[in-house]
Regions:
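Left-handed beta-helix
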Residues: 14-17, 21-23, 28-29, 34-35, ...
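Conserved catalytic-core motifs of eukaryotic protein kinase domains, centered on the activation segment
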Residues: 95-98, 123, 157-159
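Long, charged amphipathic helices and adjacent flexible linkers at domain junctions
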Residues: 1-8
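Conserved beta-strand-loop-alpha-helix hinge in the C-terminal portion
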Residues: 143-164
Length: 164
């Protein structure tokens, strides 16, 4: 088997002996991948993306300038657009009934997902949306919204009142 550095000369692998990249994987220039990470066949990873250690990246599409922190599971069919942040320990799911009918989440450009969150099958997280740490996302999140909790709900904006 060809060494990772030879297959992907423009990618930085941290401790490549402890990383497995299966066949038919595309990884963009300037991407960095942490140790103990598995990248499954068919995965497409954009340029200047960072994937932390202990991640499982299934057949999915990850955009440019994405940051996926340590211990994340990105399931088959997920689409992560450009400039997304995925906190440590985030899990995406793609099968509601465990019957093989896949319906993966989509995470739109500029979204930020707090650590330990779970994104259920078929969910769309809108552009620039923010998911609070530890949230369970069961419904689509509109662009620019902030949701927190289990089940994730929109936050209420609190504004300081001013007196004259």
């Amino acid at each position: 088997m060809q060494a990772l550095e030879e297959r992907f000369p423009e990618v930085r692998f941290y401790n490549p002996a402890l990383i497995e990249v299966q066949d038919d994987v595309r990884i963009g220039e300037g991407t960095r991948i942490g140790s103990f990470t598995l990248i499954h066949a068919g995965a497409k990873i954009g340029a200047s993306t960072t994937i932390g250690s202990h991640c499982n990246i299934c057949e999915c599409s990850i955009g440019d300038r994405v940051s996926i922190q340590t211990a994340c599971h990105i399931t088959r069919g997920v689409v992560i657009e450009d400039d997304v942040f995925v906190g440590p320990g985030v899990i995406t799911l793609n099968d509601h009934l465990m019957n093989g009918v896949l319906c993966a989440p989509r995470i739109c450009q500029g979204a930020k997902i707090g650590g330990g969150s779970v994104i259920l099958p078929g969910i769309v997280i809108g552009e620039r949306a923010l998911i609070g740490a530890g949230s369970v996302v069961r419904r689509d999140v509109p662009p620019g919204a902030t949701v927190v909790g289990n089940s994730a709900r929109p936050t209420i904006a609190k504004h300081a009142s001013t007196t004259a």
